Design a protein with these regions (language model features):
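Pyridoxal 5′-phosphate
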Residues: 1-160
Length: 160
């Protein structure tokens, strides 16, 4: 894997900020797009855009079919058992909130423990904090080594 080759596919990374190459680490809510995605979205918006799953006209049917084909591609890529396991959200922030407010509200009980790392993005801390407050759960923090990896032995000690 050649990181420079990968970065070259993202137009934003040719930009300099204060004379330095851009390093973008805030991808929880939105992420930078490679040119192939920008081009495909542009083509979709110009030639195919329609509601998904809401109409029977040809543009809507085509958009719905592509949407469902994408769901199947992702299912296959991550080796999910069923395509219905693939749920699209706007971003990771929304996805984390969805898990915390659905699964969490229904299944977490007083005294249950939620383990997250010390390096979590704010968007992966806040939903669990609210769950801790509403359900009286306990948040534990898995320690990280100097390379940013979870210290597995310490992590295992947190599981009770």
């Amino acid at each position: 894997m050649n990181i420079e080759n990968i970065k070259s596919q993202f137009p934003i990374f040719s930009k300099k900020i204060n004379g330095k190459s851009l390093v973008y680490l805030d991808s929880s809510n939105s992420s930078q797009k490679p040119m192939c995605v920008i081009n495909r979205l542009n083509d979709f918006y110009k030639n195919e855009f329609s509601n998904i799953g809401r109409s029977i006209h040809s543009l809507a049917v085509n958009a719905t079919n592509k949407f469902e084909e994408t769901r199947i591609s992702i299912k296959n890529f991550i080796n999910a058992k069923f395509k219905e396991e693939i749920i699209f959200t706007k971003n990771a922030t929304e996805a984390i909130n969805l898990v915390a407010t659905t699964f969490g509200q229904q299944n977490i009980k007083k005294g249950d423990e939620i383990i997250i790392t010390e390096l979590e993005h704010h968007s992966n801390y806040v939903p669990w904090h609210f769950l801790r407050e509403t359900k009286k759960a306990i948040i534990k923090f898995a320690p990280i080594n100097e390379d940013g990896d979870i210290i597995i032995d310490k992590f295992k000690e947190l599981i009770t």
